[in-house]
Amino acid sequence: MIGRSIALGLLLGGAGLTAVATAAERCAECVTAGAASATVRVPPGAPLAGYGGMKRRLAFPDVFGRYAHAFWFKPSIGERDPLTTRALVLEAGATRLAWITLDLVGVDRTFVRAVEDELARSGVPKATLVVSASHTHSGPGAFMDSGLMGLVAVDRFDPAVRDALVASAVAAIQQAERTRAPALAAATSVSAPAVTVSRLGKALDPEIVVLKLTSVGGTPLALVWNFAIHGTMLSAANLRLSGDVMGVASARLEQKLGAPVLFVNGAVGDVSPAHHGERAMMDTAAELSTAVEAGWAQARPRPVSTLRISERNVSLPSPAVSLERCFGSWVPGFFAVPLGFAMPRAVSLVAAALDDTAWVTFPGELQTALGQAIKHEAHGRFASVFVAGLSNDYLGYFTTREDTRAATYVACATIYGHAAGRCLADAAIDALRELRPGSRSATRASSACDSGAASR
């Protein structure tokens, strides 16, 4: 009996090894993938970023140096949940993509360059870099070298905070690079539970896109999930560092899957959570993680050999705060506060396609309608498409021409004007089109601003 069991075990083991070997042969030219997840430790007392109101601000700026890392805003008082940096490295032939997600309200180009420079110094092979912020409003501040953003919502720049975040990003990429191996991939979409509401009273995008990556043998390597939601379930009164609902949901998924889970926000400009508070946050995180887990189970990974990247540089109008869009039509339209001294006049969009799954970065908070327009135009070329919002830069809000006219917070924060949202949406569509050329859509409006493209 024992002999039969041994023989059966050897046969089953041999069959398993043969199956893995066969899969490995099928994956001889597969995309390789590596992922990592690491806890971030910022200096104690670092301020929080996201809310600009008085509940987060010091009564007086810290001109006397009472706080080591805070100036305009109150210091944090510890962590509610661990801050996490996650990384995914993809490679196919000479094409490489390094993707970093952080529990931050946003990232600016200076921060991204700091990560790029440190990656180069550390000897990590050169890759197209995407740095995505989750948009939590309870993440650390003081990491942007911008006087304007510091005053408004992030606090004065502190190199110690920025360096800690950059170091975590580089360490995560290095670890992901070390674990890189042939991978199977698949993407799917699931409907989100009713956990968001529109700031503009309009239809929202209920889609959660789930990108599943496994080893050749089926072991989970990484999960990327894309959904639009503001990280404002914790209020401005909260002074504990937190990844908010998206961070909690991702942590739950990591515990179940045993692999890094990267959250990437979507077209979030007009999207708020339906409920607020710590208990509601935990309930919403559970609902979202359950939906994403269903997407993971639904996706059927297969060998994938193509990774394409397209980059598109877009010039922008002069940025300014329009007092008419902030306070109403009674204010003459020519009254505006110019911001050209503090905000860029150009931006770069990165589009990538892993087989029939494509995404494009967006440097801020895009309105749902424009995000859905991007998806609609690209769905003829790709099975799954998503917008990676709050990635590689932060330039405020981008809305439709119609919704820029009303005096709302969203319109007030649309500092590049009523045409910039459509302009960047068109540029994003063009970047996706370059990944898989096809017939030009007859319904797509032409770009409203000059742009240049470089593709490979």
What are these language model-derived features?
Residues 1-2:
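N-terminal secretory signal peptides that target proteins for export/translocation
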Residues 5-16:
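Bacterial N-terminal signal peptides
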Residues 17-24:
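Sec/Tat signal peptide C-region and signal peptidase I cleavage site
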Residues 24-132, 136-268, 273-283, 296, ...:
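Conserved beta-alpha junction segments in alpha/beta enzyme cores
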Residues 288:
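Anionic-ligand-binding alpha/beta catalytic cores of soluble enzymes and soluble regulatory domains
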